[in-house]
């Protein structure tokens, strides 16, 4: 393998004297380089859209969204998956993140794990992957064996496969139905893909999960109406969402929120339709969980 041919491994000509810059100059240069990231992501929007459409269709068929990667790429997938539970009220199984070497690799590198094609396959076998699932392989270099092994197994099962790389003509692109290649250029610190590459991957993952959740009714207007109030902050947010969605008083929001068994989405439908809990629940079920359809 010739890493020198990968853009993510080449030296950034603008930062050759990085160790001689003042802190101010260094931060300004980092900021300038970071501004390239959203522009690079914008060029891949058509591919990201294709991925979202497939994820939504698979969710509606009972499928799951599974991210897999090694190192920073794997950690970002685990992070995005974990946030879906409190934000969108998903089950932990619906969106999952796999990292080469297992969860211990979130904090300590597991030597050799990313180089195992078999490990990538086995991690998906252990999840009992089906044709309704979507597997998103994330690798800044675009050549991680662990990810390639997972994508190949997913293809065998008939699952939808998506790849996210930060190099053009990435190897993993040949193993995915929907390849996404975000070319952010050389890192300011040569080969440190936790920087621009990691930022680019996070932006794409944000899009995949958020847009997909909108597509299955987890959002009303721009409000996260399936939020699960698992702590004090989220309880207060839930009440505020009801007020924002319905223009009702704080007192009404609290009362209906409790009547709806702390189900924000149900409470909103109850207020906007003036229905009982049972009636609103039926209306929401008929609308497949979409608040806008339930109240119109």
Swiss-Prot record:
It holds the Pfam family GKRP_SIS_N. Keywords: Carbohydrate metabolism, Lyase. It comes from the Bacteria. The active site is at residues 83, 114. Pathway: Amino-sugar metabolism; N-acetylmuramate degradation. It is an enzyme of class 4 (lyase). CDD domains: SIS_Etherase. One of its GO terms (molecular function) is carbon-oxygen lyase activity. One of its GO terms (biological process) is amino sugar catabolic process. The keyword Lyase applies. The keyword Lyase applies. NCBIfam families: N-acetylmuramic acid 6-phosphate etherase (TIGR00274), PRK05441.1 (NF003915), PRK12570.1 (NF009222). Specifically catalyzes the cleavage of the D-lactyl ether substituent of MurNAc 6-phosphate, producing GlcNAc 6-phosphate and D-lactate. Homodimer. This is N-acetylmuramic acid 6-phosphate etherase 2. It comes from Lactiplantibacillus plantarum (strain ATCC BAA-793 / NCIMB 8826 / WCFS1).
């Amino acid at each position: 393998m010739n890493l020198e041919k990968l853009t993510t491994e080449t030296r950034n000509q603008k930062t050759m004297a990085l160790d001689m810059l003042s802190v101010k100059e260094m931060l300004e240069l980092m900021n300038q380089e970071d501004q390239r990231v959203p522009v690079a992501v914008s060029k891949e929007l058509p591919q990201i859209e294709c991925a979202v459409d497939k994820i939504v269709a698979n969710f509606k068929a009972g499928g799951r969204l599974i991210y897999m990667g090694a190192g920073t790429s794997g950690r970002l997938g685990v992070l995005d998956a974990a946030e879906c539970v409190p934000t969108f009220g998903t089950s932990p199984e619906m969106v999952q993140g796999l990292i080469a070497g297992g969860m211990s690799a979130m904090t300590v590198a597991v030597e050799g794990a990313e180089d195992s094609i078999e490990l990538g396959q086995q991690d998906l076998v252990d999840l009992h992957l089906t044709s309704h699932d979507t597997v998103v392989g994330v690798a800044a270099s675009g050549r991680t064996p662990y990810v390639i092994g997972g994508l190949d197994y997913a293809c065998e099962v008939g699952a939808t496969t998506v790849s996210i790389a930060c190099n053009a003509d990435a190897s993993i692109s040949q193993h995915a139905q929907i390849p996404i290649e975000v070319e952010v250029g050389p890192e300011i610190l040569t080969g440190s893909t936790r920087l621009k590459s990691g930022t680019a991957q996070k932006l794409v993952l944000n899009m995949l999960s958020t847009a997909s959740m909108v597509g299955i009714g987890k959002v009303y207007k721009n409000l996260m109406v399936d939020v699960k109030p698992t702590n004090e902050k989220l309880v207060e947010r839930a009440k505020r969402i009801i007020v924002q969605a319905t223009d009702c008083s704080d007192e009404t929001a609290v009362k209906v929120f409790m009547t709806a068994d702390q189900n924000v989405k149900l409470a909103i439908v109850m207020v906007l339709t003036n229905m009982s809990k049972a009636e609103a629940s039926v209306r929401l079920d008929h609308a497949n969980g979409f608040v806008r359809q339930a109240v119109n």
